[in-house]
Structures are given as C-alpha cells and as structure tokens.
Amino acid sequence: MDTSYYNRFGAEELTRRLSSETLLAQGPMGSVLLSEYDAADIPPAFWNLAEPQTVSRIHRLYVAAGAQVLITNTFQASSYALKHDQIAPSVAEVNRGAVDDARQAHPQLLLGSMGPIGIEWFAEDSVEYREIRGIAREQAHALLNAGVDGLLIETVTSIRNLQPMLAGARDAADGMPVLVSFVVDEKGDLLGDGLNIEAAVFYAEKHGANSVGVNCCSLAAANAAVPRMVASATTPVTVRPNVGDPVQTQDGPVWHENPEAFARACIEWRHAGAAMVGSCCGTSAITTAAMAEALDI
C-alpha cells in the first residue's frame, strides 16, 4: 500500500494541537445538505462530485464561522455505502472529491470521516469481519492518500461496530492519527451494546485509537460523558453532540437549532479538558459561530 502521499506534516500539526488546545470542529454535513432545495433523496456522498461547489460552500461557511477543524463529507462513502446508494464513481474518486471540496475552504486541519458500514459479523475469522476490515482499509487509504490530516471513525454505537473498522483504518494508517467517536445515552452507555463509556474508551485506546470522543448524542449525554472520558482516557477527548430528533415535514426533516445552549456547553467541555468540541446533526454554521464566540476563537 503506497503511503508516500500521506500528509505527515498535517498529522503532526493535528497531534500537537489536540494535545495543547481546545479546537473547534465544524458542524454536520449530512443534515445541512438535506436542507438544500429538493435534496431529501440525494445521498450526501453524491454531492462530492456532482455538486462540489455546494460542499465547498458549506465548508467555507464553517471556516468563516470560526471552525478550525473541517470534517470531510464522507460519512457514507465506503464502497458498501456507495454501492447501496447507487453511486458509480470509485471510493478513491468520491473520497478525493470530498477532500478537495474541503481543502477549497482552506481549513487549518482536516479530518476524514468514516461512518458505520452496516454489515453484521460474528467471529474475527469470518468472511464478514474480513469484508468490513477491507472496506474500512480501502476508505481510510483513499482519504489519507487524498491528503487528510487524520481519520475520524464516528457515530460508533458498539464495540462490535468499531472492532473491524478500527483494525481496517489502522491497516492503512501507517502512523497517521485515527480518532474514534462513540454515541452514548444520558447514562454514558453506548447505544448499541450498553457498554459504559469508560470501557469503550479503554478498548479504543488499547487497539490504537489516538483520540476518543462522543458525537451525535444529546447535549445532556455529552455533558455527562465528557468529564468521565477525560478522567479515564490517556488520549485527547472530543465532543460533538446533536440537537435532538428532527420534526418531519412535507419538505423533509427540520431541526430546531439551539446555538446558545451549545455556546454555554462548550465552555464547560473546555473546562473539563476536552481537546476538540463541535456539533453534529441539526446544527449549522450558526451554532459554530456561537461556539467560536464563546471560546474566543
């Protein structure tokens, strides 16, 4: 596997700043793209090549709002997801397109998003496990080869969900940072298997994660999880909650943004020791701007 194009300088910068600052990450791509005109049935990854100017515009809005870390529009851009969504271009093309779209916004740092693959497996020597690991390896290499500063395996609901993905990402990483982010409930347990956040952090770090965090959970869940993660983790902690479930309308899902609540919360997360803060589904650059002001970025 050729790693000569990996962005080693960017990886060093990401690692250094995660260990010394509280960075502000951008908000979501998927829910913002859904709000575009007549976009309800368009898979987010489709935009990377078909409407790159739209993806770049959203990234630029986040940068203008104060985001220091951008996250590629590749949450569902594995070969499995592209096939499911009937997107013809290759994993390499779609993921490189997403990286190029984000780089147009001139971010300080750029993470490559990897979402759940959705294949069930039952043993590490099974065909399914090897398939997931290979799919993750392929996407990780595509993102790293396109120039991201690190990988972000996000919205992880169980250790079973994480295990082959983290293995595949590390197969491709060759020393590049791999961040892992879980989804937890208000009790601090993973949504998929009920494991507590401390045990999830221990597993991720033991198997090579360079950072641990939570995303796409409620503000209350994030507020409870952050100090527990900081107390148990040996790597930088990240936090990016959502605003809750959308209201379904005839024009598609509608979220009710609450930038003031996120602005208040991010101060507490920084005080607790979080290395990167941000927001997830249902927010926009409006929330990012409120957080940037609160953090004096």
Which residue ranges define each predicted feature?
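Domain-level signal for soluble alpha/beta catalytic cores
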Residues: 1-297
